Design a protein with these regions (language model features):
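Active-site neighborhood of phospho(di)ester-bond hydrolases with catalytic His/Asp-centered motifs
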Residues: 51-52, 86-91, 114-120, 151, ...
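Acidic/histidine-rich helix-loop elements
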Residues: 49-69, 94, 124-135, 156-162, ...
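Beta-strand-turn-beta hairpins that frame and shape the catalytic cleft
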Residues: 39-49, 140-150, 176-180, 227-233, ...
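Binuclear metal-dependent phosphoesterase catalytic core
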Residues: 42, 62-64, 68-69, 73, ...
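N-terminal secretory signal peptides and thylakoid transit peptides that target proteins
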Residues: 2-24
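Metal-dependent catalytic neighborhoods of phosphoester/phosphodiester hydrolases
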Residues: 89-108, 124-134, 193-196, 225-230
Length: 283
């Protein structure tokens, strides 16, 4: 792989081919084969997995097998090289809240701790959500010097919403001394996709916090790469269920390295594709 190819961010909105480095100076570099070696693996200090859009209960889809397949593949990867956690980033079910118990039972077979975000097809009130999943619609947690913020982008009616900016303002202030912040939102809030929403106030806030490393989005089943909004990478993971999108159903693996760079790729669901490395932004 040629490791000298570069392009400016302004000329390149979406990363959808293997092995890229995202640099703080605005350059994007193709990565090289080093990132696929055992030596690379030894330099990983934190590893997690993101999957979205299972759409349990959607008519005329094989949703039970979609869930069992993704759970089995994540568990296989976890046995080989453990994850710290998993995020199921929205649209867990398809509209009918009666599917929540079966969807949760399927996800409870994950061998790794998992968190969930609410998508527009997850029709539940905030109170119902917390009763089902034992976690609120907006939540945060830490692993050493790394923070993780998960927030809803919808409601019981399935409305497309901007995240709660006041909640984010409070949480970003609380986590301002952390080395890295990773954010999980089902719907892209930068209007970078056909089905995204436009949340300029949120990105005004995000742009002031240089420890935000990435925003992870689902929702757009046909989006599998990385898009840039005000120097913040928005990272997509395609889908693992539903009836449209990429021709595979997969999940995204994210690896925080000892040098604080972030390496990420999609499993489709067996092979690595769409690899990229996010270097630390200049503080």
């Amino acid at each position: 792989m040629n490791k000298t190819n570069t392009m400016q961010r302004k000329e390149f909105l979406s990363l959808s081919v293997p092995a890229f480095l995202l640099l703080a100076n605005g350059k994007i570099l193709k990565a090289h084969d080093y990132f696929l070696t055992e030596e690379h693996r030894r330099k990983v200090k934190l590893r997690f997995v993101v999957a979205s859009d299972g759409h349990y209960g959607q008519p005329n889809t094989d949703y039970e097998n979609f869930f069992s397949a993704i759970v089995n593949r994540i568990n296989e990867e976890h046995r080989k090289h453990p994850f710290s956690f998993c995020v199921i980033n929205g649209d867990i079910i398809h509209d009918d809240k009666r599917h929540f118990p079966a969807a949760k039972a399927a996800l409870d077979k994950l061998a790794v701790k998992y968190y969930v975000s609410q998508g527009n097809h997850d029709h539940a009130s905030a109170e119902e959500w917390e009763s089902i999943w034992k976690m609120p619609v907006n939540l945060d947690f830490k692993i050493k010097k790394n923070s993780f913020l998960i927030a809803t982008t919808s409601n019981e009616a399935g409305t497309y919403l901007c995240p709660d900016v006041n909640w984010f303002r409070q949480k970003l202030e609380e986590h301002k001394e952390q080395d890295n912040i990773f954010i999980f939102l089902h719907i892209n809030p930068g209007k970078l996709t056909k089905h995204g929403v436009d949340c300029p106030e949120l990105f005004d806030l995000f742009s002031r916090h240089k420890n935000i490393r990435a925003v992870f989005n689902g929702h757009d089943h046909d989006e599998e790469g990385i898009k840039i909004k005000r120097s913040i990478p928005c990272v997509f993971d395609a889908h693992f269920g539903g009836n449209w999108g990429t021709d595979y159903r997969g999940f995204r693996i994210v690896e925080l390295m000892k040098d604080n760079s972030v390496f990420t790729y999609i499993m489709n669901p067996v092979d690595k594709i769409n690899e990229a490395t996010l270097f630390e932004m200049a503080k």
